[in-house]
Amino acid sequence: MNDLRYPIGQFTYKRPITEEMIDTWIQEIEDLPNELTKAIKDLDQKQLDTPYRVGGWTVRQVVHHVVDSHMNSYIRFKLALTEKNPTIKPYKEEKWAELPDSKLPVDVSLVMLESLHKRWVNLLYSLELEDLEKTFNHPETGETKLAVAIGLYAWHGRHHTAHITSLRKRLNW
């Protein structure tokens, strides 16, 4: 692996997005709380506070970041479903990762992630095809269709889980 930042590669997807792709991505989002929990199973405090790469976040920060990011995504979906192409508020994820709550036990975020994903997945499975075409506008990256955002956040969960599993493999944990 050449770039530890992208252990599964950067987000890409085939066009056109099919219903099968959407179903797979929603399943990956649904599976994330269990996959992330498995990835950190039996890690001690020192391991949780180990960066996944030089200059990168610690395992603990990665876990908390996933919840921060997915909470924002859930809100973005709800905005896109109830408003016409809303402009969403970006956040400084690197600064959020330095806030005091990023030092909390990872179980706090794992419980949040499980509950959040139950609600989010319920919402995602309720979407009609026309809902997948709805968009939100990110001031830095532009307009994003919900269909693409589902894939992006499925990838995002696998991406950060792989940060942890690849670290464990490299260090024989």
From Swiss-Prot:
Keywords: Cytoplasm, Hydrolase, Metal-binding, Zinc. Signal peptide: none annotated. Gene3D superfamilies: dinb family like domain. SUPFAM superfamilies: DinB/YfiT-like putative metalloenzymes. It is found in: Cytoplasm. GO terms for molecular function: hydrolase activity; zinc ion binding. Homodimer. Belongs to the metal hydrolase YfiT family. This is Putative metal-dependent hydrolase BCE_2729.
